[in-house]
Each structure stands twice: as C-alpha cells, then as structure tokens.
Amino acid sequence: MSDERREGLAPEIEATGLVPMVVEQSARGERAYDIYSRLLKERVIFLVGPVEDHMANLIVAQLLFLESENPDKDIHIYINSPGGAVTAGLAIYDTMQFIKPDVSTVCIGQAASMGALLLTGGTKGKRYALPNSRMMIHQPLGGFQGQATDVDIHAREILDMRDRLNRIMAHHTGQDMETIARDTDRDNFMSPDTACEYGLVDAVLADRKALDQA
C-alpha cells in the first residue's frame, strides 16, 4: 500500500449539523480528526462566535501549542466574530503579540468590536479581509449597578479601558488617537475596501492567487 495519504469526509456527518470528521489513510492505518483539529495541523485557527473566556482559553492554548511546534512558521487565524468580553479578547491579543511566529489574520463574515481589534492585531502586512466580509469598530460597552461609589469606580475603569483599546487600535492602524476616538464613538461599520484604507487590514483577498500577490 502506498504511503501517500488519502483524505475524505466521514459519511456519517452528512446533514447532521455535527462537526465534520476527516479520515486520513496511510500505510499505518486510518485516523479520524474533526475538521478543526485537522486544520490546526496546518497551523489554521478558527476564531468564531462571541469572544468569551472559554473560547479565549482555547485560542490561547492553540497559539502556544503551534509556537512550540514551530516558532518560525506563520499561524493563520480566520475570524468571524461579533466581538465580546474585552478581557477575554485582550488575553488573545496579548498572546498574539507575545509568541514568536507571525500571526496572519483573515476576516470571514464579520469582525466586529473585539473581533476587529484582533483582526488588526495580526502581523503587519498579513492582515486580510474577504470581499463580502464586514468590520465594525466602536467604544467598549458596559453597565453596573450598586452603590454610587462603586458605580463611579466602574465608570472610570470603562473609560480607562476605552483609552487602552484606542491606543492599541491606533498602533496597528496608523491612525492618531483623536481619529480613533472620533471613529469609535458610535458603531462604525466598514467594507473591506474601507477597512483597508483605514489600516484595519492590509489587503482584500478575492482568491488564493491574490494572497500570493499580496
């Protein structure tokens, strides 16, 4: 039997809504992976859905694992997220900056709020959006009930976090703080071309050939 691997989707996943399984066959036998684990072998991470602590822990773990596997090879994060918790998103962002490999980011669908910050937090020159994706930036949301003094404490924390996020956005987009503060005062939606002009991404990709030329 040839050592060349043969891959195919396991038939039981058809029309079930379950995560597809990929079966690899070689001279050593068969092995089944869920599709995301198989793509992780190719250094592809999916950041999909609301950003929260459990999801952030999984993304951070995958980033650290891929760095340990090969610290000199790029990691690719595909983002389709409406945003979410600021602290969870910053855990992912800080890890992206901390590890040695370049981190390429690609917006598929949408990258809103914290999703947009993670998109623009990729390695300069390796941040992309697909043609029909959307990006949205805004200031952080928050609310608190309690004693007046505690409300004041939390209000000041939200303002401090807003400034921190604006500094990060300014650093990666090349926009000044005044522009970022103005443009994030309300929900600000961007097309891929507008996001590219703004500095959120570096290129809009219609196909893989465009990626080779980017």
UniProtKB/Swiss-Prot annotation:
Fourteen ClpP subunits assemble into 2 heptameric rings which stack back to back to give a disk-like structure with a central cavity, resembling the structure of eukaryotic proteasomes. One of its GO terms (biological process) is protein quality control for misfolded or incompletely synthesized proteins. The active site is at residues 113, 138. This is ATP-dependent Clp protease proteolytic subunit. It catalyses: Hydrolysis of proteins to small peptides in the presence of ATP and magnesium. alpha-casein is the usual test substrate. In the absence of ATP, only oligopeptides shorter than five residues are hydrolyzed (such as succinyl-Leu-Tyr-|-NHMec, and Leu-Tyr-Leu-|-Tyr-Trp, in which cleavage of the -Tyr-|-Leu- and -Tyr-|-Trp bonds also occurs). GO terms for cellular component: cytoplasm; endopeptidase Clp complex. It comes from the Bacteria. The gene is clpP. It holds the Pfam family CLP_protease. It comes from Alkalilimnicola ehrlichii (strain ATCC BAA-1101 / DSM 17681 / MLHE-1). Its main location: cytoplasm.
